[in-house]
Amino acid sequence: LWRGAKNRDWLRSIPGRFGGLPFRVTAPGGIWLHAVSVGEVISAATLLRAMRERLPDTPLYVSVTTTTGHALALEKLTGLCDGVFYTPLDFCFAVRRILRAMRPSLVLIMETEIWPNLWRETKRSGAGLLVVNARISDRALPRYVKMRWFFAPILAIPDAIHAQSAQDVERYAQLGAPRERLHLGRNLKYDFHPERIQTSPEVAEWVRGHAPAHVVIAASTMPGVDATDGDEDDLTLAAFEAMGLEGLLWIHVPRRPERFDVAAAKLTARGIRFVRRSQLESLTLPGVLLLDTLGELSGLFPLAHAVFMGGTLVRRGGHNVLEPAFFGKPVIAGPYMENFAEIAREFTAAGALLRIAGAAELAPRLRALLADAGGSGELARGLAESKRGATEIACRAAIEILEANWPRQRRPLFQYLLLKPLSLLWAWGARRKQNVVPERLAVPVICVGGLAMGGSGKTPTVLHLAEYFRRIGRTPGILTRGYRRVSPAPYALIAAGDPAPVSETGDEAQIFVRAGIAHLGIGGDRVDVGRRLLAKWPVDVVLLDDGYQHRRLHRDFDLLLLDAQDPLSGGSVFPLGRLREPAEGLRRANAIVLTRVQRGREYRRLLAYIEKQKPGMPVYRSRVVPGEWMPSARPEGKAAAFCGLGNPASFWATLRLMGIETCYRWAFGDHHQYRPAELARLKHHALEAGATVLLTTEKDWMNLPPEAEKILQPLTIRWLRIGIEIEAEEALLAQIRQQMKIQYRTN
């Protein structure tokens, strides 16, 4: 509270530090990457970019500890990840709150972030745990060794630890980490890409306008640990005064935002001419540009002729010298580089980093560097580029662990104790239902269903099969329950191509009506409705929609759909989880289709689980294919999106696949019936975000009130038609034909 009183950003971060998320997670199975502050956020950008290329459909979330890191992450990572949030305090309740909301398949920790409760709760949730860019500094090692008894069991928790250097591997082993889980992963900071860094056009123009003869950057200056240490702002500004060079532009960059005003006061007290980056004005050289903004230091390195790296003249352990090195700039550092000891040793030995023993040497060494025309800078660039490769190693490790894990649903103890008996009762009832004697229809029946409540792609799969049967000359019929229909009639029969109101069909069945490719029977008693369907039309194959647990109707082929991102829906039967029956029910299937598969994923653990349950089970994969926008093409402009689906993340992923970045989005509950007041609020938020177009799904379009378009004006609303594609589809169709003895024929 005291810290929050002094720093409003910290005060606003408190809900997040106790497990609150600033966004809604709509799909499990993503990756949570934890970075501490500014330096780790910059390294995370390269890693996230590589992971997004390999796993374009997998949700990526980033947590940070500091307010400055949070601000930079929002600025730099928004297009690379699906959400930025504050790392929870290492209390079990706060960590569990995040894990229950997010349900990641992998938690990826960067550098030396050893949080016992976060690590333990991650593994208890079913997620994998990977530590990358791991290091233990010279200064921290003695303290850690004294507490080996504490660290050894914690370091046994991660699935793998990828250390920056061979020395770090040995240090982790010394602390008790299992040897078989330790790997040499290199340093992510070497994978910095200077070509991706842009200098602020405003600053670049300002510098060009002043035509400095020399540009020196004092980067990430720090106060001392105590009074005997000194203050790098004082020490470096004294060096600036001592240099006395005509045309010198000194760019002064305090490490922390709270030091901006302190540095300005010191400049004023010394009588040094300066301007602040936030208030660019004309400056007579020699003078100082005080960088009082975040995230712009990297973009200034190309302008420099020499760089002093802060945190090295006082006992702070130093900062990363790799960024200026990649730009080919000569770098000076003081004696304190414990945080980057190996980098400092390698660069110093190669002549790529100039070390000074104290502040008195800074001014003369800078003078010498400015006369050197970049010799040590080119050495630094060459050495830094030779050390690349950590990102590729980290990506491979992350994907391997991601493939080996999927999230479990862990409820609070009081919920578990309350719901477990009800879950057992539900499971008993589900098993009992399997004992009924099924009744046959006069034609083959294909069931398309799932184990869990909620969406798994059943509707588009049924339509896909109906189109296939019509294409080969069959007359398909569809049987469906008609969820959320409000008609008092016990059933409805609708001919292919005929219209029917949503009140008579329900929203999902209305999609079948509008497709117009199959006769449709709607009702709870699907045996009775099926017979009525056959009596009315010459249907010769029936598709049973969402009927895997409807055992009264005999089926000739059971096609089970499993959502690849949450195949067992938390692993528990309703109401403890979302399973309609115990997971072993998948053994009844003739074939399984993994729906919503993500590009770059192999799902090895899921395939192994299915093989264990029923050896030889045929498994296929499907993904959503976006169709056309209705009722006409999507107009240009910023888009907002909303939906009410069992798995809203599938819609967001489809939009991303189409290259549509939404400025605002909101997920409602499955089968949501929209009220005018909700649409008015939706319009307000979308317009506030700058949207001109509102995007939704076909199912949601049907659940809008008649006056929706009028309420949403001036926004233009469009809904998306979707289909699916099935890998090895012909093999699946051949299996269905063989099982049902349907011979292929055309009209």
At which residue positions do the language-model features occur?
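Active-site and donor-binding regions of nucleotide-sugar-utilizing enzymes
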Residues: 2-197, 218, 222, 228, ...
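Catalytic binding pocket for nucleotide-activated donors in carbohydrate/polymer assembly enzymes
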Residues: 158, 302-382
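Acidic donor-binding loop of glycosyltransferase active sites
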Residues: 102-106, 285-316
